[in-house]
Regions:
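N-terminal beta1-alpha1-beta2 submodule of the flavodoxin-like/Rossmannoid cofactor-binding fold
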Residues: 2-119, 177-192
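A short, structured active-site edge motif that brings together acidic residues
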Residues: 49-55, 127-129, 164-167
Length: 192
């Protein structure tokens, strides 16, 4: 018979190494999805396909979430569960594609909806921001826009790996970036 203290201890050990990977690309087998799967295979981390969740953007409300988080008209769409997993993780890795020189729209939905999760509780925001985060931007263009967008998610400078298909003789739309051993090594070195 397992004692409760053993179960709690086992749970703590698992939680000590908990990594979460958030894939923001809507492409099922594109570079971001394949990168997220590669990292999950290397680390055992859970992958959340944010774009596939159908998370609603902010809007069609009167800012009820700023008064009480549960009052957000979109709480049933799963966004708060994603934020909770990030907040409880030991590390979160974001994999974000470039759409027209900026992170994709799913990234901005993710950023917007944090207002409802944090509400007026600064302690939750502090805990969320304190979680170590790494960012992988699949982009052939503007790095500065990613640095600014990711900077809101961390205390200090964001830790970003920029992967440009053109640097490896690839075409982004082909989704074959992770077929290159140099890319795999670069990702492994970044993840640690």
């Amino acid at each position: 018979m397992v004692k409760l203290s053993q179960v709690e201890s086992d749970h703590r050990r698992k939680a000590e190494n908990m990594r979460v990977i958030i894939n923001f690309s809507p492409r099922k087998n594109g570079n971001c999805g394949r990168t997220a799967k590669l990292i999950a295979d290397m680390t055992g981390a859970e992958v959340i396909d944010f774009a596939a969740l159908g998370i609603s953007p902010c809007g069609k409300c009167d800012y009820e979430c700023f008064k009480k988080t549960e009052n957000c008209p979109h709480t049933s769409d799963g966004a708060n569960e994603v934020y909770r997993k990030i907040t409880e993780s030991d590390e979160t890795i974001f994999v974000v594609p470039d759409f027209c020189d900026f992170p994709c729209s799913a990234w901005f939905v993710f950023s917007e909806r944090q207002c409802g999760y944090f509400g007026t509780d600064g302690k939750i925001a502090e805990k969320f921001n304190a979680v170590p985060k790494k960012f992988i931007a699949i982009t052939n263009t503007n790095k500065e826009n990613f640095v600014r967008a990711f900077g809101d998610q961390v205390n200090g400078e964001p830790d970003i790996l920029f992967l440009a298909a053109k640097d490896f003789g690839k075409i982004s739309l082909n989704g074959d970036l992770c077929d290159d051993p140099r890319v795999i090594k670069t990702i492994k070195d970044f993840i640690g």
